[in-house]
Amino acid sequence: MNLILASGSPRRKELLSLYTTDFTICVSDFDESGVTAPTPAQLVEKLARGKCLAVAKDHPGAVVLGCDTVVDVGGEVFGKPHSVEDAKRMLHALSGATHEVHTGVCVSDGVRTESFVDSCKVTFFPISEGEIDAYTATKEPYDKAGAYAIQGRAALWLDQLEGDYYTIMGLPVSRTALLLSRF
């Protein structure tokens, strides 16, 4: 299989390597800015599909894997923060609260396209102002949906998790492996 990961995420590269190391990376140039959907879960599936198909059209015969992840706080979508203030706003909203993380996964071989969304509920302990200030002073929150890396320092805030841990990291490994095995 000529497998292409349509993502520049180092976490997705690492997680896909659990399934196979035989893949290449081609970052999608899909424009996400005008994409809308009725729910965050539907949005993330549309984004994953858009990224996947944007790469698939230029690579006939390849199997392309596209993904996207969003944090859902009561219906409000948190993507990657645009600034320190944006990251702090997100972390304040997540502090002491439950939110959902949705990861959309799409696979296409140019003839057939299949996708799914995996969702996970996450509850954080209250996060102090000092912790938020210290965390946002690092590079960690700025390339992650919801301004946190669960596999990083944000693990200290994790109270409860319901679902697949890898969904939070951006690639639900077992469901993705099952989907890829059908191509």
Map each language-model feature to its residues:
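Short loop/helix-cap segments at secondary-structure boundaries that form the rim of catalytic
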Residues: E14-L18, V35-T36, K57-D58
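Short linear Ser/Thr-Pro motifs
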Residues: S7-S9, S28, S95
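Residue-level detector of short coil/turn "hinge" positions at structural boundaries
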Residues: D22-F23, Y142
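Short, glycine/serine-rich, charged loops/turns that create anion-binding
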Residues: P10, F30, V173
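N-terminal beta1-alpha1 ligand-phosphate binding loop
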Residues: M1-T21
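A short beta-strand-loop structural module common to alpha/beta enzyme folds
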Residues: T24-S33
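Anionic-ligand binding patches
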Residues: N2-I4, A37-F183
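Short, solvent-exposed secondary-structure junction/capping segments
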Residues: F23-T24, T69
